[in-house]
Regions:
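Small-residue-enriched hydrophobic alpha-helices in membranes
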Residues: 1-225
Length: 225
């Protein structure tokens, strides 16, 4: 049976955690409606029901480090969810990487695996349309394997973090679709499982989170299915 202990973070830690995710979402200058809806649902329904989304602000690396405390597992778990927020749409931009790097330094962490993720950075000056995280050539091996292993190390011990993962990662791979304007196709969006080579990894984390909520917390997980 699962022996995972349930450890809840304090409200101050969760507030700082959420503000950190907001900071990542704002990093590239585009706070999409999908990101707004996700953060709002996490705030109102899952993490801090009494907190108004509009009252939340971005957070500096120094303040984040102070609020999260000294526990290395807590700090690294936060950083994992911050990376998940950054790569959820299949694109890892330089502004997002900068925020993640600043958070990592302030938290006193040195995650070697993140260097492999930086090799996938999208450079808008070279491409008008994000092409997503690019898997390596076969001859290079899987350069993203280190970050996959690192993401897999997240501790799912707080139900609010587990709910975050379940909300963050869709239950099914989003279908490919065409974006049209005045009846003319302007861009084709491939399915997320092809766009983002880390998508399968995120799905695995989602399954672990569902299992934690159902088995350890005895929660009804049907809303996430």
């Amino acid at each position: 049976m699962n022996n995972t202990k349930t450890i809840k973070y304090t409200d101050r830690q969760i507030t700082a955690w959420l503000r950190g995710l907001l900071t990542v979402a704002y990093a590239d200058g585009h706070f999409d409606p999908e990101e707004q809806e996700l953060i709002a649902s996490l705030t109102q329904d899952e993490l801090l029901p009494c907190t108004d989304l509009g009252s939340l602000e971005t957070i500096s690396p120094t303040e984040l480090a102070q609020e999260l405390g000294d526990d290395s597992h807590t700090k690294e778990n936060f950083l994992r969810t911050a990376v998940m927020m950054a790569i959820a749409n299949g694109v890892y931009s330089q502004p997002e990487a900068n925020v993640v790097h600043d958070f990592q330094e302030a938290l006193g962490l040195n995650v070697e695996a993140l260097k492999s993720l930086e090799s996938t950075l999208w450079h808008p000056e070279k491409s008008e349309i994000p092409e997503g995280l690019k898997p390596p050539e076969e001859s290079q091996g899987d350069v993203l394997q280190p970050v996959k292993n690192w993401l897999d190390g997240i501790d799912i011990k707080d139900p609010r973090v587990a709910r975050f993962v379940c909300k963050m990662v869709p239950s099914q791979c989003p279908f490919e679709r065409d974006i049209t304007l005045f009846g003319r196709k302007i861009v084709h969006i491939p399915p997320m499982c092809k766009l983002n080579p880390l998508y399968e990894q995120l799905v695995g984390l989602r399954f672990r989170s569902l299992s934690f909520l159902a088995d350890d917390c005895q929660e009804d997980v049907s809303p996430y299915l």
